[in-house]
C-alpha cells in the first residue's frame, strides 16, 4: 500500500512538472515607431512637350525639335545627360466630335515627357524655367528625395525598435515583471514621405517663366518613418 502511494505521488509530480513546462511563459506584444527628419538632396522633375499638327510627319518633327531644345537647355545648366531620360512618349490622332455624334480627324498629337534628376537643389527652379522657356508646356511632377535613403530608413527602424523596447519595459515594470528575451519581431513598414503639390509647382512655373523671374522652389523636410511589432517574453 505504501509502495502504491509513493508511486502515485511520483506520477503526480511528473505530470504536474510536465504540465507546467508546457505552459508558455507570458509575453508582451508592443508596437514601436521611429521618425527621422532629413533635408532632401535630390529632386526629380518631369516636364512634357505636347505638340499638335495636321500632318503626322509635321507633328513628329515639331515635337522632336522642341524636345531636343528642352534637353539642350537643361544640359547647358550643368545637368549630365545620364540624368535626363524619356519618361514617356505617345503619338495619337486627334478627333473633333460633332453634335450629330460623328467625329472627324482634326490632326495628330505627340507628347514627349522628359525626366530630369537634379542633385543640386539650387538648380531646380532654373531647370523648370529653362524647360518652359524652350518649348516644354507641361510640368507633370516635382518630387524631392534622398540619395542615401537607406541610411535614414535604418535610423528610423532603429528608433522604432528602441521605442518598442521602452514601452515593453514600462509595461513589465508596472506588472512587477522583467523582460527575459525577444520572442518575435515584425517590421510593419519603412518609408520616406514628402507631400508635394505638383499642380501648384506647375502653376508657379508657368507664371514665373512668363514674368522672366526664376521659379522659387522650397524643398521642405522629408520624413523617414518605420514601425515594428515586437513580442517580448517576460518573467512568470
Language model regions located:
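Short, charge-dense linear interaction motifs
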Residues: 2-6, 15-134, 138-236
Amino acid at each position: 500500500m505504501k509502495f502504491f502511494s509513493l508511486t502515485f505521488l511520483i506520477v503526480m509530480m511528473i505530470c504536474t512538472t510536465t504540465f507546467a513546462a508546457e505552459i508558455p511563459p507570458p509575453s508582451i506584444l508592443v508596437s514601436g515607431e521611429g521618425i527621422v527628419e532629413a533635408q532632401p538632396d535630390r529632386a526629380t522633375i518631369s516636364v512634357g512637350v505636347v505638340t499638335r499638327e495636321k500632318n503626322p510627319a509635321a507633328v513628329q518633327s515639331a515635337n522632336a525639335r522642341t524636345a531636343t531644345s528642352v534637353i539642350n537647355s537643361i544640359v547647358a545648366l550643368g545637368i549630365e545627360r545620364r540624368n535626363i531620360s524619356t519618361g514617356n512618349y505617345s503619338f495619337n490622332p486627334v478627333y473633333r466630335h460633332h453634335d450629330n455624334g460623328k467625329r472627324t480627324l482634326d490632326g495628330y498629337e505627340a507628347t514627349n515627357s522628359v525626366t530630369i534628376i537634379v542633385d543640386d537643389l539650387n538648380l531646380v527652379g532654373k531647370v523648370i524655367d529653362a524647360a518652359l522657356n524652350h518649348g516644354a508646356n507641361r510640368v507633370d511632377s516635382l518630387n524631392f528625395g534622398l540619395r542615401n535613403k537607406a541610411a535614414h530608413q535604418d535610423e528610423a527602424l532603429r528608433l522604432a525598435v528602441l521605442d518598442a523596447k521602452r514601452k515593453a519595459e514600462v509595461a513589465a515594470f508596472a506588472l512587477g515583471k522583467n523582460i527575459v528575451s525577444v520572442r518575435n519581431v515584425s517590421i510593419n513598414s519603412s518609408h520616406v514621405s514628402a507631400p508635394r503639390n505638383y499642380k501648384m509647382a506647375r502653376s508657379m512655373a508657368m507664371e514665373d517663366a512668363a514674368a522672366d523671374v526664376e521659379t522659387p522652389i522650397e524643398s521642405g523636410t522629408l520624413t523617414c518613418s518605420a514601425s515594428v511589432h515586437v513580442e517580448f517574453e517576460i518573467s512568470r
